[in-house]
Curated annotation (Swiss-Prot):
Keywords: Electron transport, Heme, Iron, Membrane, Metal-binding, Mitochondrion, Mitochondrion inner membrane, Respiratory chain, Transmembrane, Transmembrane helix, Transport, Ubiquinone. Heme b b562 binds at H83, H182. The gene is MT-CYB. Coiled coil: none annotated. Its cofactor is heme b. This is Cytochrome b. One of its GO terms (biological process) is mitochondrial electron transport, ubiquinol to cytochrome c. Component of the ubiquinol-cytochrome c reductase complex (complex III or cytochrome b-c1 complex) that is part of the mitochondrial respiratory chain. The b-c1 complex mediates electron transfer from ubiquinol to cytochrome c. Contributes to the generation of a proton gradient across the mitochondrial membrane that is then used for ATP synthesis. It comes from Martes americana (American marten).
Length: 379
C-alpha cells in the first residue's frame, strides 16, 4: 500500500515541498533563511491578529489602545513587543537572504528572484504601515514625510497624495486605511511566498559551489528539517532576548509621545531597517531624483541577473568579487548609520559618497570585476 502522504492531494503537496524534496547535499546555514522568513511571517500574522483584537484604528484612541494592550491585556506587553521586534528579525533575515542570493548567484533563477523582489517591496510596505498604527510622534511624521514623497510625481503627484491621505493631511482616514492595508498585506505576502517556493521547486535549490547538484541529492526530511529547526531555535532565542531584555532597543523614544501635528520632532527617521534607503533618498538634493533613487535602490536587484558577466555562478571561487561583495555590505552599514544622523556636515558628504558607491558596485564594478576574473582564468 502506498503511503498516504504520497497519494492524498493535499498531503502530496506538503510531501513534495518539505519531506521528499530532493535537496543539494552541501547547502550551508545561509540556506536556512527561507524557512526562518516563513517562521517570522507566521509569527507576525499570529501576534498581529491578537493585537488587532484590542487595537482601535482611530486617531483619538489608537495611542491609548496600544498602552491598554501593554498594561491591561493578559500578556499584551509580550505580544506587542514580539510583533515590533519580530519585524526587526524579519528584516535581518530578509537582508541576509538577499545577500546570500547575491553572493551565490541565486539570482540566476529569474522567476524566483523577481517574485522575491516583489515580496521585499510588499514586506517593506507592510512594515511602513504598521509603524504608523501606534500613532506616536514618529508614526505621524514618518507617515507624513514618506507619503509626501509621492507628490514628486509630475502632474498627478499632489492629487495622488491627497487621495492616499483621504484628506488634506495625515489624519483619521489615513490611519483607518493603513490599518486595513496592514492587516491584508501579510496574507498577500503569504500567497507570494507560496509562488516564490513554487518557482524555486521548478528548478531546485542552488548550492554554495554554484555547480548543478542533480547527481548528488538528499531528501529534505530529516536532513534539512532538523537543520531548519536548529535555525528556528536560534531565531526564537535572539527574538526573545530582544523582547525580554531590551524591547525598545531598536525603537524610537519619540514614538512614546502621542502624535501632535503642531510639533515636529527634531529628527524624523524611519525604523532602522529603512535607514539605508532613507540615506539614499536624502543624499540627492532634488525631490523627484531622491524618490527615484529610493525606489531604484531596491529595484536595482532586478537588473543584477542581466549584468552577470562571470563564467561562474557563485562567488565561492572568485576572491575579487568577494572583496567587492563585502565592500557592498560595509557600504550598506554605512548608509544605515548615515540615515539615522542629522542632515549636516560631514554626514551629507558621507551619505552621497556611500550612495554613489552602492550603485557603482552593483551596476559597474561587479560586472567589470567579473570580466577581469574571466580573463584571469586563462592565465
Amino acid at each position: 500500500m502506498t503511503n498516504i502522504r504520497k497519494t492524498h492531494p493535499l498531503a502530496k503537496i506538503i510531501n513534495n515541498s518539505f519531506i521528499d524534496l530532493p535537496a543539494p547535499s552541501n547547502i550551508s546555514a545561509w540556506w536556512n533563511f527561507g524557512s526562518l522568513l516563513g517562521i517570522c511571517l507566521i509569527l507576525q500574522i499570529l501576534t498581529g491578529l491578537f493585537l488587532a483584537m484590542h487595537y482601535t484604528s482611530d486617531t483619538a484612541t489608537a495611542f491609548s489602545s496600544v498602552t491598554h494592550i501593554c498594561r491591561d491585556v493578559n500578556y499584551g506587553w509580550i505580544i506587542r513587543y514580539m510583533h515590533a521586534n519580530g519585524a526587526s528579525m524579519f528584516f535581518i533575515c530578509l537582508f541576509l537572504h538577499v545577500g546570500r542570493g547575491l553572493y551565490y548567484g541565486s539570482y540566476m533563477y529569474p522567476e524566483t528572484w523577481n517574485i522575491g523582489i516583489i515580496l521585499l517591496f510588499a514586506v517593506m510596505a507592510t512594515a511602513f504601515m504598521g509603524y504608523v498604527l501606534p500613532w506616536g510622534q514618529m508614526s505621524f511624521w514618518g507617515a507624513t514625510v514618506i507619503t509626501n514623497l509621492l507628490s514628486a510625481i509630475p502632474y498627478i503627484g499632489t492629487s495622488l497624495v491627497e487621495w492616499i491621505w483621504g484628506g488634506f493631511s495625515v489624519d483619521k482616514a489615513t490611519l483607518t486605511r493603513f490599518f486595513a492595508f496592514h492587516f491584508i498585506l501579510p496574507f498577500i505576502v503569504l500567497a507570494l511566498a507560496a509562488v516564490h517556493l513554487l518557482f524555486l521547486h521548478e528548478t531546485g535549490s542552488n548550492n554554495p559551489s554554484g555547480i548543478p547538484s542533480d547527481s548528488d541529492k538528499i531528501p529534505f526530511h530529516p536532513y534539512y528539517t532538523i537543520k531548519d529547526i536548529l535555525g528556528a531555535l536560534f531565531l526564537i532565542l535572539a527574538l526573545m532576548m530582544l523582547v525580554l531584555f531590551s524591547p525598545d532597543l531598536l525603537g524610537d523614544p519619540d514614538n512614546y509621545i502621542p502624535a501632535n501635528p503642531l510639533n515636529t520632532p527634531p529628527h524624523i527617521k524611519p525604523e532602522w531597517y529603512f535607514l539605508f534607503a532613507y540615506a539614499i533618498l536624502r543624499s540627492i538634493p532634488n525631490k523627484l531624483g531622491g524618490v527615484l533613487a529610493l525606489v531604484f535602490s531596491i529595484l536595482v536587484l532586478a537588473i543584477v541577473p542581466l549584468l552577470h558577466t562571470s563564467k561562474q555562478r557563485g562567488m565561492m571561487f572568485r576572491p575579487l568579487s568577494q572583496c567587492l561583495f563585502w565592500l557592498l555590505v560595509a557600504d550598506l552599514l554605512t548608509l544605515t548609520w548615515i540615515g539615522g544622523q542629522p542632515v549636516e556636515h560631514p554626514f551629507i558628504t558621507i551619505g552621497q559618497l556611500a550612495s554613489i558607491l552602492y550603485f557603482a558596485i552593483l551596476l559597474i564594478l561587479m560586472p567589470a570585476i567579473s570580466i577581469i576574473e574571466n580573463n584571469l582564468l586563462k592565465w
